[in-house]
Amino acid sequence: MKVNDRVTVKTDGGPRRPGVVLAVEEFSEGIMYLVSLEDYPLGIWFFNESGHQDGIFVEKAEQD
C-alpha cells in the first residue's frame, strides 16, 4: 500500500473503519501506516506485523 490508498483498519471492539494512508514507514518487523480516520483526520499510526495474520491491522479497501 502507498500514500493516498483507501484502506480499512481493524480497531478493538468494532467493525473495520475506512481511512486513507497519509504516510508509510518500513521496518524489519513490518510496516507502519499513518492513516486518516473520520475521528482522527490528522492520522493515527497502525503497525502491520510481518508474517502474523493477527498482526495485520491495515488492509487495502475493496474497489466498488
From Swiss-Prot:
InterPro entries: Dextransucrase_DSRB
Coiled-coil intervals, chain numbering: none
Top-rank lineage group of the source organism: Bacteria
Stretch forming the signal peptide: none
Family the UniProt entry places it in: Belongs to the DsrB family.
NCBIfam families reported for this sequence: PRK10708.1 (NF007981)
Official protein name in the record: Protein DsrB
Gene coding for it: dsrB
